[in-house]
């Protein structure tokens, strides 16, 4: 179907592809290098949103390798319910070593307060404007004292551009 083809194209731009039998195959991925460059240039705590489970796991692993395991936590469908609030509490604690919140915007984009961050990176987007707006509002809400910067990682000439255009 067209939707399946579009999803596969999007996965490829993110650095992996899921085969028909459910196997995830990593691909050469410059996006993760770009993300690490953005993080190096960012100060303070950073929220990173990604659509795919494999991307969230890869991002968490790469950040842990670069900055240390204690600096990153992931928040997505596989995150146990009893751990989720402690991740948010730890991230909101300005004295905590937890600097990077990596999440799926459908899982973590609703109801959370993450105002300790003024940098939000979209590693990938989906077509839902509602999901995008809700995830943006995690950092930009009452309690935020700084201007929030939103960064979209976009591979030129790919489906990324179409998705971001649809969101605008």
Where are these regions (language model features)?
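Active-site donor-binding loop signature of nucleotide-sugar glycosyltransferases
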Residues: 11, 77, 125, 153-156
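Short amphipathic alpha-helical segments
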Residues: 59-62, 112-116, 133-134, 164-165
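A short beta-strand element within the Helicase C-terminal
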Residues: 112-125, 148-152
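Flexible glycine-rich beta->alpha loop in the catalytic core of nucleotide-sugar glycosyltransferases
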Residues: 108, 126-127
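Conserved Helicase C-terminal RecA-like lobe
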Residues: 1-112
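A conserved SF2-helicase RecA2
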Residues: 127-168
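Short, well-ordered beta-strand core segments
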Residues: 101, 119-121, 139
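Conserved beta-strand segments of the P-loop GTPase G domain that flank and frequently precede/overlap
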Residues: 49, 103-104, 122-124, 153-154
């Amino acid at each position: 179907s067209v939707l399946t083809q579009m999803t596969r194209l999007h996965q490829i731009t993110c650095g992996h592809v899921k085969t028909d039998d459910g196997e995830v195959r990593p691909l050469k991925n410059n996006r993760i290098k770009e993300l690490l460059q953005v993080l190096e240039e960012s100060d303070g705590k950073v929220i990173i949103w990604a659509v795919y489970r494999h991307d969230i796991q890869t991002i968490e692993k790469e950040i842990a390798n670069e900055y240390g395991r204690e600096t990153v936590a992931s928040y997505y469908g596989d995150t146990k319910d009893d751990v989720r609030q402690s991740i948010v509490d730890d991230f909101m604690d300005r004295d905590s070593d937890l600097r990077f919140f990596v999440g799926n915007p459908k899982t973590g984009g609703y109801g959370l307060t993450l105002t300790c961050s003024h940098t939000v990176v979209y590693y990938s987007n989906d077509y839902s404007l509602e999901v995008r707006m809700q995830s943006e509002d995690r950092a930009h809400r009452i309690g935020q004292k700084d201007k929030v910067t939103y960064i979209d990682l976009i591979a030129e000439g790919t489906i990324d551009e179409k998705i971001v255009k649809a969101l605008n």
